[in-house]
C-alpha cells in the first residue's frame, strides 16, 4: 500500500465515524439468505462484516434461511416437495429433515463463518429458550366451481405467535452473536418450519432493532421503470402494494418489513445481498444499496 492508498483508507474510516456513533450499542437484525449465502466470497465477506459490527459496538442478531439446502437433502432422501404461495408444504417426516438441515447443518456453517472472522457467535434455533412460539399457518383458496373458500393445510408450517427475546438478551449481554435457525415451537410442543424472512421480521420487532437488514437477490424495491426506490414510508409501501407496482415475491418481503416496523423496529432495509459488504455499505455510508422502509 502506497501513501496515497493509505490516505484514502484513512479518509474512508474517518467518514464512517458519524455512522459508528449513530449505531453504537444498538441492535441490528440481519436476515441472511439467497445468493449471499451460497457464493463463497460473499459468504466469507458476510462473516467479516458481522464480526466487524460486533467489534465497533453494535449488537448483531443473524437469522438465516436454508431453502436450497433443504431441497437438496429432501431430493437425496427422495422426498417430494410441494409449494403453495411460496411455502413448502411440510408433513411430520419432512419437518424432522428441515430441522436437521437448518439447526444441525446450516446454522453451524453460518456460526463458523462468523467465528472464523474473529467474533464469538452461538447457533440456536427458535425453539431454544422458547424464542419463537408459533402457531400453524393456513392458507385459503376459493374453489372456482363452488365459490367457497377452502382452507389449505400446509402441515407443519408455522407463523410466529410470540417472540420471547430473553435468550437473545442473555447472549448479547455475554458478548455473543446469536445465529438463529427459523424453527419454532407450538403450544403442543410440535416443531414448525417458519419462513426466515418472517422470523427475522418478528424478532426485529420484538427486540426493537434499529435496523432489520433483509439480504435478497434483487437491488431492492423497484419502481415502474425498474429504478431503485431508495426510501419508502409505510403508507407509500402499502399504496404501491395495493396498486400493483410492488408485486410478486417482493410483496411478502415488504410486508415483513412493515410488520417489523409496526412491532417496534425503527426501520427495515431490503438489501442486495449480491453486493459485497452490503451490510456495511448500508450502515456506514450514505449510499446504502437497497430500499429503506420506515413508519
From Swiss-Prot:
Family: Belongs to the acetylglutamate kinase family. ArgB subfamily.
Domain of life of the source: Bacteria
Keyword Iron-sulfur (UniProt): no
Site entry: Transition state stabilizer: 31, 253
Keyword Cytoplasm among record annotations: yes
Catalytic activity reported: N-acetyl-L-glutamate + ATP = N-acetyl-L-glutamyl 5-phosphate + ADP
Protein keywords: Amino-acid biosynthesis, Arginine biosynthesis, ATP-binding, Cytoplasm, Kinase, Nucleotide-binding, Transferase
Annotated compartments: Cytoplasm
SUPFAM superfamilies cross-referenced by the UniProt entry: Carbamate kinase-like
Protein name per UniProt: Acetylglutamate kinase
GO BP, sorted A to Z: arginine biosynthetic process via ornithine; L-arginine biosynthetic process
UniProt-annotated binding residues for substrate: 66-67, 88, 193
NCBIfam families found in the cross-reference section: argB (TIGR00761)
Enzyme Commission number(s): 2.7.2.8
Function: Catalyzes the ATP-dependent phosphorylation of N-acetyl-L-glutamate.
Record-level Gene Ontology MF annotations: acetylglutamate kinase activity; ATP binding
Principal place of residence: cytoplasm
GO cellular component: cytoplasm
Enzyme's top EC category: transferase
Pathway annotation: Amino-acid biosynthesis; L-arginine biosynthesis; N(2)-acetyl-L-ornithine from L-glutamate: step 2/4
InterPro entries: AceGlu_kinase-like_sf (IPR036393), AcgluKinase_fam (IPR004662), ArgB (IPR037528), Asp/Glu/Uridylate_kinase (IPR001048), Glu/AcGlu_kinase (IPR001057), NAGK-C (IPR041727)
